[in-house]
Amino acid sequence: PLFDSLSDENRSGIMIGGNMVSWYGGFDSLMLAQSVTDEIYQPKMGRRQEGEEQLGLTQLPYMDWDGWIKELNKRKLGIHMMRTHAAGTFALNCSYLGIPCVGYNDLDTQRILHPNLSVDDGDLESARKIVHKLWNDLDFYKENCILTKKLYQEEYSEKVFRERFKI
């Protein structure tokens, strides 16, 4: 695989997905992240709002996909509370790297790849409890790192893709 040489040692902080436009859920993701750390990162996105960088997070510059994966790999945890279930690449990218991601059940990649970390839409209290457990319980954290990597291989690896689409 493409990024096998990336190390999962020395990960720190939280990467949140989405910006502060309501349907991206960035504010909800930020509040959850701030409940455990002030080391919070966010990729710049097309619907970015002026002043987002003043909310106590590090906003990353636009980057290509390789740069994004390398930057995401530096983080301990992903949070993406996006209520519009249109994409799913954030949960998928986290899983590929073995990074636990908290998000909503209705997004298929979230539910399939991070089953212990998925909550019903709008259930931020349950999400907060999961974030705290991941941050403070090393066994739970490691269990979910291992599980998501395993599920990625079973559900979304190149081999599975080729078999599914008969390539």
Where are each of the predicted segments found?
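Nucleotide-sugar donor-binding loop of glycosyltransferases
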Residues: 81-83, 98, 104-106, 123
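Short acidic active-site motifs
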Residues: 66-68, 126
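Acidic donor-binding loop of glycosyltransferase active sites
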Residues: 70-86, 99
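Conserved catalytic-core segment of nucleotide-activated headgroup transferases in glycan assembly
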Residues: 2-65
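A charged, aromatic-enriched C-terminal amphipathic alpha-helix characteristic of glycosyltransferases
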Residues: 136-167
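Short alpha-helical segment that forms part of, or immediately flanks, the ligand-binding pocket
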Residues: 69, 91-97, 110
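Conserved acidic donor-binding segment of nucleotide-sugar-dependent glycosyltransferases
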Residues: 115-124, 133-138
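Short acidic/histidine- and often glycine-rich active-site loop of Leloir-type glycosyltransferases
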Residues: 103-118
